[in-house]
Amino acid sequence: MRKKLTELLVCPKCHEALDCQPELIADDGDIRTGSLRCAGCQVSYPIERGIPRFVPTGNYATSFGYQWNRFRQEQIDSLNGTRQSEERLRNETAWDSSWWNGKTVLDAGCGAGRFLEVSSRNRECDVVGVDLSSAIDAAQETVSGRSNVHLVQASIFELPFRPRSFDGVYCIGVIQHTPDPKAAGQSLADVVEDEGRIAVTIYERRWSTMLYSKYWVRPVTRRIKAEWLLNLIKTIMPVAFILSEVLFRIPVLKRIFQFILPVANYVDSKELSMRQRYQWAVLDTFDMLAPAYDNPQRYADVVEIMKERNIGEIQRLSNPGLNLVGTKISSSEVAL
């Protein structure tokens, strides 16, 4: 943990200042171990392996911790030879490359650092990655050595940051996996600076969404131990992958088969090799079936949440899912 991060942090419970008490400091000034003690409620939060930890181990995101420590490399552009994460981040934020200069940005639900690895390439931008699960340790390995990246293990519902700390916040594919998507969205909006930007991508709920086959089996699969579920998927995948290779390519009918087969196979991807598609099929099928929560949201509901938290200039981008971007209305304008 670097000193600059301490300037943003507050107690997630009472929002009072934190006193940093380092125990081991690396040669580059990185605080490897120590604690952060709240001046108000006197709670002490540990700093372990260079990461401040504001939540206990073991929570509703445990499957994601297992997932991203097991599949850390698969979706990292610099490791898989593609630009998929770079293009997705650019498309789903719609933030011009020059906008990032001099900004402080939050990656909410950073996982193994798929998008952190991209956003932190601009060394003039400080990026904070936060995740509830042990995936934060996988992210640390992904962005190792980048002094403009700061990592925090915390809950999206109790973000340990000062209000309006960030010039930009992006949260891609995370909110639907929380027990309370509305509260998660509100929490994110609260840490956006006046005239700052926010971008979210969420599973969209339509009349047919809950008929999708993964929702038929999730009541069972989400209760299976992560290791057992992954082994089950690996056992089934050789047959499921071949079957989906055929069915997902049939004109007109392929959408029906994608709807009724709970298998992730990106048959239309030009960048991924067959081997990579197979790895992603295992990863994303697990991602569909393992999470404790999967709560798609309606467009109108998400827009209402954003407006309640003074997000204006809301636009829906033409990307898969419910992808919304907006700008925080300044306090002076709200007062008027």
Model-derived features: where do they sit?
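Conserved N-terminal segment of class I S-adenosyl-L-methionine
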Residues: R2-P160, Y293-P296, D301, E313-L336
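SAM-dependent methyltransferase
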Residues: E227-P291
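Short catalytic micro-motifs in class I SAM-dependent methyltransferases
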Residues: G173-V174
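Short, glycine-/aromatic-enriched active-site segment of Class I SAM-dependent methyltransferases
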Residues: Y203-V220, M274-A292
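Conserved class I S-adenosyl-L-methionine
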Residues: R197-N231, T235-P238
